[in-house]
Design a protein with these regions (language model features):
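Strongly charged
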Residues: 1-56, 63-143
């Protein structure tokens, strides 16, 4: 069975020229979410481990990834990809003037690896009108 990535068409205007007619672009639309419980169930069906074991490992992975990123490490998840912290803020004229108070924001960068990049090359697309509405409840154990 073919899998299709859904998209809708949205108008985007140039913020510097709001009076100019915008152009229409594709915007990916989620069909739903795959939470930790569903992912654990799917993985269980592919392996010899139980769903509970998979969930335990994934929850531990969350903690280890967060700790590694906080320690300034690049987290490499095999061919899935890598995560790294990136900083943004104000600049100074000289290196000596710079101090950590000028750092305004930290964010996490994800770079897809071979597995995800290969998937991108096989995508097929389906145009939809309606946007996905997020579920009210979070799919987390114990919540």
């Amino acid at each position: 069975m073919d899998k299709y990535l859904t998209y809708s068409v949205v108008e985007r205007k140039d913020p510097s020229s709001p009076e100019v007619q915008g152009k229409y672009y594709a915007q990916a639309q989620a069909r739903g979410e795959a939470g930790i419980r569903e992912m654990s169930q799917r993985i269980q069906q592919m392996c010899t481990v139980t769903r509970a074991d998979v969930m335990a490992v994934l929850i531990a992975l969350e903690d280890v990834v967060a700790d590694s990123l906080a320690n300034g490490e690049i987290v490499r998840l095999g061919e899935l990809g890598s995560l790294q912290v990136s900083l943004s803020g104000s600049g100074t004229v000289t290196k000596e003037e710079y101090h950590d108070g000028l750092i305004e924001k930290a964010k996490i960068l994800f770079r897809g690896g071979k597995t995800l990049n290969n998937m991108l090359g096989t995508l097929k697309f389906e145009k939809v009108d309606q946007k996905y509405k997020k579920k009210e409840e979070e799919d987390r154990p114990g919540v």
